[in-house]
Amino acid sequence: MVSHSELRKLFCSADAVCFDVDSTVIREEGIDELAKFCGVEAAVSEMTRRAMGGALPFKDALTQRLALIQPSRDQVQRLLAEHPPHLTPGIRELVSRLQERNVQVFLISGGFRSIVEHVAAKLNIPTTNVFANRLKFYFNGEYAGFDEMQPTAESGGKGKVIRFLKEKFHFKKIIMIGDGATDMEACPPADAFIGFGGNVIRQQVKDNAKWYITDFVELLGELEE
């Protein structure tokens, strides 16, 4: 059993930190915002809640929600232009501080790459450090499904990404930070998990995470000590 002080040391000596995006790096759930924009918010929000609570296999939840939303390429582009995602307070400073320490920062999301890349640009995170789901569109821009080959399209996908990062870059210590069950499941192979409840509290995560925070200032403080 890793103690809290050992977890803090792990975080401060990590060579890579992976963040979930929806309700962690940004305040919103991207798929819920897309559903709201497309007029099917209520049904999709309930599915998101069940998926994040671990009650529904992730790929099933994603397939069902997207079948309801049917987002076109134009709708995704207009969502980003008219309702860009809001960064969680403190995340810009935390990512910047980690990068100053030569820590590699990755975004691993069950959300959509087009939205996550927009967030990555705000945080000076290269697109090569983004792992997320890809929406597919027909030539006329209508919804054509999603890329089911992406590891993030299924339960356990975030762990697969972290395993891939360890094999590719030989990272010794990878930390996963996020609000949901799929984030907590990524440890192991992540060396430590930090639960985040600054935007929404998932009781299962709060009850089981050995380190649970509600403000990124706490992690910034650890790096400054």
Swiss-Prot record:
GO terms for biological process: in utero embryonic development; L-serine biosynthetic process; L-serine metabolic process; response to mechanical stimulus; response to nutrient levels; response to testosterone. The active site is at D20 (nucleophile), D22 (proton donor). Its EC number is 3.1.3.3. It is an enzyme of class 3 (hydrolase). The keyword Transmembrane helix does not apply. Pathway: Amino-acid biosynthesis; L-serine biosynthesis; L-serine from 3-phospho-D-glycerate: step 3/3. It is found in: Cytoplasm, Cytosol. CDD domains: HAD_PSP_eu (cd04309). Keywords: Acetylation, Amino-acid biosynthesis, Cytoplasm, Hydrolase, Magnesium, Metal-binding, Serine biosynthesis. GO terms for molecular function: L-phosphoserine phosphatase activity; magnesium ion binding; protein homodimerization activity. It comes from the Eukaryota. L-serine binds at D20, V21, D22, S109, G110, G111, K158. Gene3D superfamilies: HAD superfamily/HAD-like. It catalyses: O-phospho-L-serine + H2O = L-serine + phosphate; O-phospho-D-serine + H2O = D-serine + phosphate. Mg(2+) binds at D20, D22, D179. Its cofactor is Mg(2+). Its main location: cytoplasm. The modification N-acetylmethionine is found at M1. Phosphate binds at G53, T182. Belongs to the HAD-like hydrolase superfamily. SerB family. This is Phosphoserine phosphatase. It comes from Mus musculus (Mouse). The gene is Psph.
